[in-house]
Amino acid sequence: MRRKLIIGLCILVVLLAGIGIYLRNGFYGNCVLERRSLYVRSGSEYRTLEDSLDAAIAHTAFFRFYACHIELDRSFKPGHYVLEPGMNVVQVARMLKLGLQTPVRVTINNVRTPAQLAGKLARQIEADSATIVGALTDPATARKAGFDSVTLFSMFIPDTYEFYWTVSPAQFIERMRREYDRFWTPQRDAKRQRSGLSRLEVMTLASIVYEETRQSDEMPRIAGVYINRLRKG
């Protein structure tokens, strides 16, 4: 009788250990096999998010269980998320719950009209081009930034920036105003004045140069060519 009890206890321990390992692997084992981006649009339904994750992660049953536990279906954040190999379902669910976005890189160069800039931005952030154009051409927005609708474009300094994918057009413009103020140091402004160019002309020239080359040692030569053309009319 005692022998049977011991055997039964051993079997129970093995079963419990097996269940524990199974659950641990399900919740904390690797559920992401390859790096990929996940875009969650504002106002998305939870079912849409689940469908996207079904194609991106393993252990989906465990994800659904944990997501239900933290009420992810009631509260998840839109944004751009990067699923990295080695992540588990707990990490993925918490990332979406807390809105731990990965910024996107936004390159501004060779744009001379609101429509061109809006088209470029709309491929890199959530807002559509029509909404972006509306903000870029809004006189009130330009005045708030300290410009008018004509000179607002001199604020956009050609470079590559990091934004959250969910950045609104208004937030984008505010950020670019800060970058503009940071760029125009007294030393740079004095150098610009000596060149005889306006800030708008400098920004236009910078956009052209940035489009032609990314090599910093070539930029002065190319800029000099265009400055000579401007002076010759």
Predicted feature residues:
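Conserved catalytic or metal-liganding residues and their short signature motifs at active sites
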Residues: 1-233
